[in-house]
């Protein structure tokens, strides 16, 4: 290690090595290696020397600069070969534009698929798809199969880009939409490209049939190989055509197009095994002489677009492997099949649940965008047929049965009441469309946006309460036996609470909370949010029953026949049951964490620049914009959760027993649910072992150990299995 003591000359000769520089230069260099190593010996293992001039900013800069990914922009200077574009490569004879062999076609197609997927995963077109020279200008290609495939890939990219841009549920880390001035085959129609692909497909199918083995005939190995290779090209070309046709179907406004896409996805899935089994037939990439692992093979040049990249450090594009490509397409097909199912839903609440469940799989940006554009066609109508206002009214009817939406009620035909409810419903459209759009974003961005949308729902809550009061006053004059109190307000409050719960729970999924914070997060959920949610659901259920009774009495008055009463399943009963289970899980975790803290098993940081209060207030800051339910401030929380108010205050064994009862209660509730879904089974996988662990801890197991427990979130994203170490 050397250090420059003074600068006497300029930095000419910067390409020389350090010893050569030292010899040539007039500068006085001092070797500090020995001194540096001796100074390092004084530091203990893991200890760092803090210098005033070397703070966190400089440390991060050093880490970033030394990361090999930061050398991506420098690769061009370290290549031993000449980088050629498509036209230069044709003149140079390094690329074939006609008479491509079957292995060449297979290899190029597979690598193109890999580049396409890498682009969909957030890298730029310049570093992925457009490293394939054939894609730059398909007009130069004379080979019909290669030309049709290149145009097909361009069209897939163009429609995918249009869909993702239209849905607007991507961030810079999800998707790069820049085309860098490349033509996206706009001069050729979609129909023409699918026709060209079909022609190649038919031609390949004829070759597949002509090389097929016949009964009793001895098989020529060369003919068999040709048969396998023709089948491989046929499968890839057909897959490209089907994928393109699916994306075209999603651009149509008719709902029938979704059914068409569903059928095509089945065809695409059937082709994947043939593609997977023939991966070895394609030409393989040669060893790259550059740093990085971009494939170098005929038709590909990873550095061809290096000059198009922005002056900032380019992202390091690691092209996925061919084996992974098939698995990715299989998952993409499954996701698109799921997207197609949304058109079968009619209730807004079911649609919201569908979006939540779909988002939990962390789907790719393309499938998220397709779901958004299928739901709201041109941002006007749901599935292109239903008005969002009608969906909101149906959701209100099914959830809380407000008298104003009942045809048998006086308010239904009252102009003033009609104006009130119509105005409220119109104001609901934007927040609910925004909420559905939020579920299209990636999981990390969703949480941030949920925090912001609470403000809109708080305003809606205020309006709902005012409309309820106005409608109630009108109703009392005509039908004193009926009430219109807290109908619309209950419905908006329900959605408010769901957003708040989702906001807090997603923090566990994203690993945002430290272990010492768990106890107040679970407390807020169990004692506050789930308690409010259950009372809101019970109130909605009560409103439904009251409305049903009035309807039955009106029916009785008209009909003298006695009708047999069937036991009706309450629409909200399952949700109330699930909320009870969630509340018990949260309460069990809260008491577990408090007991661990008492036993000294929770490591707490030495707060220097902040405190627990600062952290608490930061975690619940978005809730300050909500008036109902009112936010619980830190001092209020400390007072409400203070165990000293009990006489005598419970000790850790009693808390472990209480926690075990909560886990047992959750287990019993869930085991009684008919037709349990995946979510029920996932929670049971946590409730059962936690019940056993709490029993062990209550009996004094590992009482003296101060080793913190492990929290395993693999079974469920929000509730960990507690493991004693």
Swiss-Prot record:
This is N-alpha-acetyltransferase 35, NatC auxiliary subunit. Keywords: Cytoplasm, Phosphoprotein. One of its GO terms (cellular component) is cytosol. It comes from Homo sapiens (Human). It comes from the Eukaryota. Transmembrane segments: none annotated. Auxillary component of the N-terminal acetyltransferase C (NatC) complex which catalyzes acetylation of N-terminal methionine residues. N-terminal acetylation protects proteins from ubiquitination and degradation by the N-end rule pathway. Involved in regulation of apoptosis and proliferation of smooth muscle cells. Pfam families: Mak10 (PF04112). Component of the N-terminal acetyltransferase C (NatC) complex, which is composed of NAA35, NAA38 and NAA30. GO terms for biological process: negative regulation of apoptotic process; smooth muscle cell proliferation. InterPro entries: Naa35/Mak10 (IPR007244). It is found in: Cytoplasm. Residues 548-573 are annotated as: Disordered. Residues 558-571 have a biased composition (Basic residues).
């Amino acid at each position: 290690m050397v250090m420059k003591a003074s600068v006497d000359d300029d930095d000419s000769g910067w390409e020389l090595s350090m010893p050569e520089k030292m010899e040539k230069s007039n500068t006085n260099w001092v070797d500090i290696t020995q001194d540096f190593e001796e100074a390092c010996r004084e530091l203990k293992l893991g200890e760092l020397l803090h210098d005033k001039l070397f703070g966190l900013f400089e440390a991060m800069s050093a880490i970033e600069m030394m990361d090999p990914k930061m050398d991506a922009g420098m690769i061009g200077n370290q290549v031993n070969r000449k980088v050629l574009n498509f036209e230069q490569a044709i003149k140079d004879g390094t690329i074939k534009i006609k008479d491509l062999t079957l292995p060449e076609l297979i290899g190029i197609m597979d690598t193109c698929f890999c580049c396409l997927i890498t682009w969909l995963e957030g890298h730029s077109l310049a570093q992925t798809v457009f490293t394939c020279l054939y894609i730059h200008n398909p007009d130069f290609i004379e080979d019909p199969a290669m030309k049709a495939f290149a145009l097909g890939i361009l069209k897939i990219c163009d429609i995918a880009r249009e869909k993702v841009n239209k849905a607007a549920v991507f961030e810079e880390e999800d998707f790069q939409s820049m085309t860098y001035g490349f033509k996206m085959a706009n001069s050729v129609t979609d129909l023409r490209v699918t026709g060209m692909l079909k022609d190649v497909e038919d031609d390949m199918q004829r070759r597949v049939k002509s090389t097929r083995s016949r009964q009793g005939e001895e098989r020529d190995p060369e003919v068999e190989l040709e048969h396998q290779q023709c089948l491989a090209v046929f499968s890839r070309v057909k897959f490209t055509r089907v994928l393109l046709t699916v994306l075209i179907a999603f651009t149509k406004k008719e709902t029938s197009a979704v059914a068409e896409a569903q059928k095509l996805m089945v065809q695409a899935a059937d082709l994947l095994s043939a593609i997977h089994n023939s991966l070895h037939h394609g030409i393989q990439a040669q060893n790259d002489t550059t740093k990085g692992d971009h494939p170098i093979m005929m038709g590909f040049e990873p550095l061809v677009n290096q000059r198009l990249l922005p002056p900032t450090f380019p992202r390091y594009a690691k092209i996925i492997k061919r084996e992974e490509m098939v698995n990715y397409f299989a998952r993409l097909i499954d996701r698109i099949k799921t997207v197609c199912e949304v058109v079968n839903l009619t209730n807004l609440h079911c649609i919201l649940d569908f979006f939540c469940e779909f988002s939990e799989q962390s789907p790719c940006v393309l499938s998220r965008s397709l779901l958004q554009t299928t739901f709201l066609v041109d941002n006007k109508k749901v599935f292109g047929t239903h008005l969002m206002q009608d969906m909101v009214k149906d959701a209100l009817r099914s959830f809380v049965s407000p008298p104003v939406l009942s045809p048998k009620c006086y308010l239904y035909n009252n102009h003033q009441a009609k104006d009130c409810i119509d105005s409220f419903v119109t104001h609901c459209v934007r927040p609910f469309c925004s909420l559905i759009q939020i579920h299209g974003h990636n999981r990390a961005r969703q949480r941030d946006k949920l925090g912001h949308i609470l403000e809109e729902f708080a305003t809606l809550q205020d309006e709902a309460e005012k409309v309820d009061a106005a409608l109630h006053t009108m109703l009392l004059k005509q039908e004193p036996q009926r009430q219109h109190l807290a109908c619309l307000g209950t419905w908006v409050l329900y959605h408010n609470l769901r957003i708040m719960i989702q906001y807090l729970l997603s923090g566990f999924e994203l690993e945002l909370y430290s272990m010492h914070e768990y106890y107040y997060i679970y407390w807020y959920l169990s004692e506050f949010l789930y308690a409010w949610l259950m009372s809101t659901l019970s109130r909605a259920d009560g409103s439904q029953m009251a409305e049903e009774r009035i309807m039955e009495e009106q029916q009785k008055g008209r009909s003298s026949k006695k009708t047999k009463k069937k036991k009706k399943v309450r629409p909200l009963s399952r949700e109330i049951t699930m909320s009870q289970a969630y509340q018990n899980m949260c309460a069990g975790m809260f008491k577990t964490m408090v007991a661990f803290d008492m036993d000294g098993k929770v490591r707490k940081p030495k707060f220097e620049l902040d405190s627990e209060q600062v952290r608490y207030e930061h975690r619940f800051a978005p809730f300050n914009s909500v008036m109902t339910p009112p936010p619980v401030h830190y001092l209020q929380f400390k007072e409400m959760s203070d165990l000293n108010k009990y006489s005598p205050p419970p000790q850790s064994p009693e808390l472990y027993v209480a926690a075990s009862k909560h886990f047992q209660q959750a287990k019993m509730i869930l085991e009684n649910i008919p037709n349990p879904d995946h979510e029920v089974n996932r929670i049971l996988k946590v409730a059962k072992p936690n019940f056993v662990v709490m029993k062990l801890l209550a009996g004094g197991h590992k009482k003296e150990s101060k080793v913190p427990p492990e929290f395993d979130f693999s079974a469920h994203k929000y509730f960990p299995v507690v493991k004693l170490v």
